[in-house]
């Protein structure tokens, strides 16, 4: 199995875990920061221009409940970059939760509610 296939499979399992834990929410995968954050200043927009978040949970009114990041081994050594990404999302008013492994349904419910 290639590294790409392994990472994709890991994300796919997380998607279905989120769907199982939160059937009342819409789960979006691979959402561009530009769909979540707006700014007319080009310099500021350039900071998040090509960034993508793993999962966004939306309620029935399409309000963002939580942003979920699933950090695979490629994130090792990128803690500062991840913290900066999280800070951008927090500053925009979003809650962010990071996992290094696919959590149990109970953990997800505890963390996200």
Each model region followed by its residue ranges:
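Solvent-exposed, charged helical/coil patches
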Residues: 1-41
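Conserved catalytic cores of phosphodiester-cleaving nucleases, focusing on short active-site segments
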Residues: 18, 55-57, 66-70, 89
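Active-site metal-binding core of divalent-cation-utilizing nuclease and nuclease-like domains
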Residues: 29-63
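Active-site-adjacent loop/helix micro-motif of nuclease/hydrolase catalytic cores
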Residues: 48, 75-82
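Arginine/glycine-rich "motif VI" loop of SF2 helicases in the C-terminal RecA-like domain
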Residues: 60, 87-95
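Short coil/turn motifs at secondary-structure junctions
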Residues: 60, 73-75
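Acidic beta-strand-to-loop metal/phosphate-binding motif
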Residues: 67-71, 97-100
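Basic, glycine-rich
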Residues: 93-113
